[in-house]
């Protein structure tokens, strides 16, 4: 399954900047708080595969390539299994591979990643979307995966609803930029607890606050 990648993302952002030009000018202070002037227009980029309120889904043996944003996104979903897949999105801004978001019982194994951002990003909503709805991501299992390019396995930064019971093992993140990372903005809220990492190789381990992606 392939999409237009960076070319499609650039076209969508350019069109949305024109569509929102009056709004962006009126809300210049909000734009200044974002990662860059393309952040808000970039929100409309589609996921390659999006699952909303889904149950009991198995994704097996696919190559997911060059989504304009995240490649597989599961939100408010339960019991999602993904295995023996390849995620390819080098050069795509925010080109995450596999993103469970306010979802439970999600399992990922035997997959390869060469992504433009996080290989895996475990999320639970951003700001009010997360802390008012209050649905954590929980019981997330990732094993026997390899990242050859991209940022590695991440918890956050959209995690206002909380993240708990994450188990990661037998993963090779040697060639990833971040290795294993826990990140949030200083005012985001939420929590991370019950994370286990074992028998992995990683370029580094990061636990930190980040200054971007704070709008919402």
What do the predicted segments below correspond to?
Residues 1-216:
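Extracellular/periplasmic carbohydrate-active domains that bind, remodel
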């Amino acid at each position: 399954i392939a999409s237009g990648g960076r070319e499609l993302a650039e076209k969508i952002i350019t069109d949305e900047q024109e569509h929102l030009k009056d709004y962006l000018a009126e809300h210049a202070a909000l734009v200044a708080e974002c990662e860059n002037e393309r952040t808000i227009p970039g929100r409309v980029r589609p996921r390659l595969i999006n699952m909303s309120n889904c149950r009991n889904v198995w994704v097996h043996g696919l190559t997911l390539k060059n989504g304009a944003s995240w490649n597989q996104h599961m939100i408010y979903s339960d019991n999602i299994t993904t295995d023996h897949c390849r995620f390819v999105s080098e050069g795509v801004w925010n080109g995450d591979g596999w993103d469970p978001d306010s979802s439970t019982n999600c399992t990922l194994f035997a997959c390869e990643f060469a992504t433009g951002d996080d290989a895996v990003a475990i999320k639970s909503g951003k700001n009010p979307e997360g802390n008012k709805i209050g649905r954590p991501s929980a019981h997330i299992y990732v094993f026997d995966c390899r990242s050859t390019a991209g940022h590695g396995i991440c918890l956050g930064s959209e995690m206002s609803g909380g993240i708990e019971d994450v188990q990661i093992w037998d993963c090779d993140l040697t060639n990833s930029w971040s290795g294993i990372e826990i990140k949030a903005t200083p005012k985001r809220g939420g929590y991370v607890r019950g994370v286990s990492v074992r028998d992995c190789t990683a370029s580094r381990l990061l636990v930190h606050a980040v200054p971007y992606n704070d709008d919402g």
